[in-house]
């Protein structure tokens, strides 16, 4: 909280102080439009200012929340000024009192009244209490998790089903691929891909732990990753491609042995669907690449929900993602079209979802809103209807022990956001 002294000096705030106040009150979207505003400019804002650039498209509530916060700021400023000009809440007036030696001294009397105080009624506008712009709603997050888990299990089942349909490599050789024509296979490349993927997932999990609004963000992650794997179930089932290389040693077909298939599915789930764990030795899950999905999606979430000033962190994660995707092709474990389709679907679904989530008008179905025609629009409305505006990149320390300050003080309760 800002101190009373700081409140008193609000009119003298610099643009940097205004930006700090906006971040402190979870309104980072105003930092860029108001980057040159002083404290005096801030408290002079009116409803009309939000009907013209640069503020008319910043928030879906027409700036009402910011105006309410400014009213609170004015109220606290007024109370501090009133307190400093009055004694115990009442005006004090000095009068001359004669002394025995003929001189005069000044004696203060409350409100100028010789025998008591006169009450003053002050009308202070109080902003109406509002509910949180970013409710946690963990129940919805749990439903999104169940959806993602169901899609992952369904994908695993579908891999086992498709494996039975893959033609032997001796009968149906690999399809021609331009990348394979120019790059020879590197045996260890796929292990590098999976290691990079595990590093990115680990970084994202650690970053997620520090997020203040982790419920909303994880809900979005589960919805997107679940839908991507659901799409993957469809594409791999409708078109079964032959193995991309003669190096593949696919596990034997089971020919209707459902008990053995269940054991194989459980083994694949337990190993996370990774070849490096020895759990994935089935063929047929080519169109499109699940490894590309995770490498791309984890990078997109890491970049979207981390401070802009951590550009070096973004570049490291981007490099891990790009090298991992390149190694998929270098290992000849997926056709190039598998990677291209996976990248395209992942990025478009991520961008569409976040565009719709960040624009209040797109959360309402209408003739003009063509995005409302996607099949997952109703679930999207259910998960996002109570989230107002862009979710801040706000971090906090989630553990019971205090954080150790090394070089400079870091306040985890404040927004670490460079918009």
Swiss-Prot record:
Tell me which parts of the chain lie in the Cytoplasmic compartment: 331-419
Q: Which gene encodes it?
A: Sgms1
The broad enzyme category this protein falls into is: transferase
At which residues is Phosphoserine found?
Answer: 14
Transmembrane as a keyword of this entry, yes or no, is yes
Which species? Mus musculus
| Stretches that traverse the bilayer | 142-162, 190-210, 221-241, 282-302, 310-330
Topology in the lipid bilayer is annotated as:
Multi-pass membrane protein
Q: Where is the active site?
A: 291, 334, 338
Purpose of the protein = Major sphingomyelin synthase at the Golgi apparatus. Catalyzes the reversible transfer of phosphocholine moiety in sphingomyelin biosynthesis: in the forward reaction transfers phosphocholine head group of phosphatidylcholine (PC) on to ceramide (CER) to form ceramide phosphocholine (sphingomyelin, SM) and diacylglycerol (DAG) as by-product, and in the reverse reaction transfers phosphocholine from SM to DAG to form PC and CER. The direction of the reaction depends on the levels of CER and DAG in Golgi membranes. (Microbial infection) Contributes to the brain SM production for Japanese encephalitis virus attachment and infection.
- For this entry, the protein name equals Phosphatidylcholine:ceramide cholinephosphotransferase 1
